[in-house]
């Protein structure tokens, strides 16, 4: 996609601090990191949301993220992937953030459970199993 910033990074039209590349994926340092070592791993295949991505590309991304996490030698890290504007996706191209977490750096999460009960959860599980 010609207007996509990540597609332009992959093509070399926009420079990046490339770390790793395969036939299917590209990994580079985030230019606005939350912590030292904050990396983005993106598919070369353009897709806006994860469920639109091929299984091969998705597998490749996760293997690369694992390889980079091991190379960074960080004990704690987050893998973050957002889908859609309401989920805080800013660039409409699938991307996985690998964010090393230290005491003073990294991703901060405010987790607010919506409340539920086991009957509701079991009903939801039954309905979803039928679709899988």
Spans of model-derived segments:
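HIT superfamily nucleotide-processing domains
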Residues: 1-132
């Amino acid at each position: 996609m010609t207007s996509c910033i990540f597609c332009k990074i992959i093509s070399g039209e926009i420079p990046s601090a490339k770390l790793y590349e395969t036939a299917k994926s590209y990994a580079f340092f985030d230019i606005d990191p939350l912590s030292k070592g904050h990396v983005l791993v993106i598919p070369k295949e353009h897709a806006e949301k994860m469920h639109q991505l091929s299984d091969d590309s998705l597998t490749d991304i996760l293997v690369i993220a694992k390889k980079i996490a091991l190379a960074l030698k960080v004990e704690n890290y987050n893998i973050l992937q957002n889908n859609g504007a309401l989920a805080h996706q800013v660039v409409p191209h699938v991307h996985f953030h690998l964010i090393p977490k230290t005491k003073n750096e990294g991703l901060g999460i405010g987790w607010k459970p919506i409340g539920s009960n086991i009957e509701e959860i079991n009903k939801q599980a039954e309905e979803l199993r039928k679709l899988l």
